[in-house]
């Protein structure tokens, strides 16, 4: 009877400990996804503010595409972490700080910027050097009229560096994805799967088993509607579960995702 009682006690302890750890992990995930989202928005706002300062300088001249403003692009690009700066006229003709010229009137970021809004593109492959970049843009105002757009671009790898990489002590990673599930940026690597820009995360996660009545279909629906959530995934080679937490970034319908390995009661007791 004594051995039976000890056995029942150990089982009870394990169940309670696991629930406690699970609850703690979920709360940590929710906190971290909020931190990650706020951190990224803060960095992007710094870039926007910098571009708006340059745009004000450019707007002081009588002509948008004069030599003085082209020189301003070159000077200011050297003092920013953005790869390229470009000045775009109302017809979509863009002049870059390296002297390249092309028309971008078909781009979404041009249409948003010329309408007087800050803009951020989805990842685009550069026709100049074939690098994949995102473009930030701000309108250039002169007497309350939009006379052009000032844009800066950064490599998706640099966008990834804007994410915290120390949230999980090596037990997880962060993602920025489109509402369709395409990877925009990431930090950290899963041990059982290599991440690639543009990859559809649902293709990988659909091979996993969901816990607690959730489904990948539910996650897809939440992405499409811009809603936050958390799902527990099983089916990994090491036998452990993963938590996938996600929330809208508030920019471009992008989602911020965190994936974290669920600790066992033993891990929780020794951490």
Feature roles, as predicted:
Residues 1-19, 23:
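Extreme N-terminal signal-anchor transmembrane helix of membrane signaling/transducer proteins, especially
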Residues 158-252:
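Intrinsic low-complexity, intrinsically disordered coil/linker regions enriched in small/polar
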Residues 34-35, 39-70, 87-98, 202-203:
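Extracellular/periplasmic ligand-binding regions of membrane signal-transduction receptors
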Residues 152, 256-258:
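Sensory beta-strand/linker motifs that couple input domains to effectors
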Residues 41, 58-62, 73-81, 163-169, ...:
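Short regulatory alpha-helical segment in sensory/regulatory domains of signaling proteins that mediates
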Residues 261-265:
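Conserved small/polar residues in nucleotide/adenosyl-binding loops
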Residues 26, 30, 48, 52, ...:
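Short amphipathic alpha-helical segments
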Residues 79-81, 85, 90-166, 170-173, ...:
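Extracytoplasmic/periplasmic ligand-binding sensor regions of membrane-associated signaling proteins
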């Amino acid at each position: 009877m004594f051995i039976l009682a000890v056995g029942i006690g150990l089982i009870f302890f394990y169940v309670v400990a696991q629930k406690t750890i699970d609850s703690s992990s979920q709360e940590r995930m929710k906190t971290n996804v909020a931190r990650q989202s706020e951190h990224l928005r803060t960095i992007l706002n710094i870039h926007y503010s910098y571009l708006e300062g340059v745009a004000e300088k450019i707007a002081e001249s009588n002509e948008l595409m004069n030599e003085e403003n082209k020189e301003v692009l070159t000077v200011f690009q050297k003092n920013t972490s953005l790869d390229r700066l470009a000045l775009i006229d109302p017809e979509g003709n863009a002049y870059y700080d390296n002297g390249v010229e092309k028309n971008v009137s078909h781009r979404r970021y041009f249409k948003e910027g010329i309408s007087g809004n800050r803009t951020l593109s989805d990842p685009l492959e550069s026709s100049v050097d074939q690098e994949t970049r995102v473009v930030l843009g701000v309108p250039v105002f002169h007497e309350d009229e939009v006379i052009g757009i000032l844009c800066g671009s950064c490599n998706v790898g640099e966008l990834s560096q804007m994410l915290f990489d120390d949230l999980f002590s090596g037990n997880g990673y962060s993602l920025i994805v489109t509402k369709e599930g395409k990877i925009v940026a990431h930090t950290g690597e899963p041990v059982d799967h290599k991440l690639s820009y543009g990859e559809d995360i649902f293709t990988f996660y659909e091979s996993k088993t969901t816990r607690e009545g959730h489904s990948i279909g539910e996650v897809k629906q939440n992405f499409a509607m811009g809603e936050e959530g958390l799902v527990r995934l099983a089916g990994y080679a090491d036998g452990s579960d993963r938590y996938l937490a996600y929330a809208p970034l508030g920019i471009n319908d992008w989602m911020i995702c965190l994936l974290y390995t669920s600790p066992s009661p033993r891990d929780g007791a020794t951490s």
